[in-house]
């Protein structure tokens, strides 16, 4: 890393990019970047840190810069192109992360689902017991002086995580996603195996994932889960409307009893992964148990609020497995309320590839609404629509429009979950405004 130069982030509002920018800023490096004008939830942290966000413009690029290119941008992007013409260093997000994790005990969290929640939980817990830097995919990042640990999210998309050589890796699951890049599940597993082979001390994987069980590695692989053949096991699990409680064993050794203020089976597993890696690093488990109690969650992962008589949940879920986990968590916390799902399909390629799985997961809700498909920067149209998905859903499937959220007014004292990785929040805000205005009129 070069403290004399300015790090310029192309696409600085991206979830990982904003976190990385904050870390470099905390470490004393000069940081600024560019992005679209549209407000994103990652922006607040950058603004609070005093990091400038400029519109895309080749004139932003100066001689004293190192350019960090966001994963969505190629060499034809105007600033990246200008940097190459000027002979400046242009490096990717993963390459930059790899540079800053070398001085610590690094823990990379990978998985098709759950990596942001797990890395956020691990960062919170370890920060409470030892100096810890972290880079989480919800836009949060912190560079702590003399950190013992560095927790970071390792993204499999386009094999970005093969740039990393962490001390430890947590792998929550392997699933077929990103069909615009991966050809099949074997292709995905091959990517994870590459990361496994580059991990230096140990790997922690969910034991019930048959693809993770097939991984080859040069270091010990520890399985965590609820089955008798798992190395780290959660037993005597009690799920209530306040959270979950469970005992943890490492083989036949009792490690401790833990309470978590979180919902859904997936959060028990995420917590178990955190307990496992901290145990192997000989961190006091009483301290771990104490820190687990205070975790408030990560941004856009089961974020709750109450408006009028409704519970509104915002969640990043955009894959069938994530939708299932989110609805399961809502049912645990609100067993006596109807669960209404409002889902924004994310990318045409994913909607086509997982159409039946989406319909099955969404049908776990009591009523389902859809929005139009949110296309990625790499695709502008496709041969599928939300109406096509809606026809396969047994409990609704009506497509909502932003200027008419009134169908949701049929529900009272229930739970509405807005799910998606695009701009689903604008639908949520439109619904909240509608509810608030009605409440004012009725009072």
Curated annotation (Swiss-Prot):
Biological pathway: Cell wall biogenesis; peptidoglycan biosynthesis
Enumerate the catalysed reactions: UDP-N-acetyl-alpha-D-muramate + L-alanine + ATP = UDP-N-acetyl-alpha-D-muramoyl-L-alanine + ADP + phosphate + H(+)
Where in or outside the cell is it found? Cytoplasm
The top EC class, named as a word, is: ligase
Against InterPro entries, the record matches this protein to: Mur-like_cat_sf, Mur_ligase_C, Mur_ligase_C_dom_sf, Mur_ligase_cen, Mur_ligase_N, MurCDEF_pg_biosynth, UDP-N-AcMur_Ala_ligase_MurC
**Domain of life here?**
Bacteria
Which residues participate in ATP binding?
111-117
What family does this chain come from, according to its entry?
Answer: Belongs to the MurCDEF family.
Q: What protein am I looking at?
A: UDP-N-acetylmuramate--L-alanine ligase
Question: Which source organism does the UniProt entry give?
Answer: Ligilactobacillus salivarius (strain UCC118) (Lactobacillus salivarius)
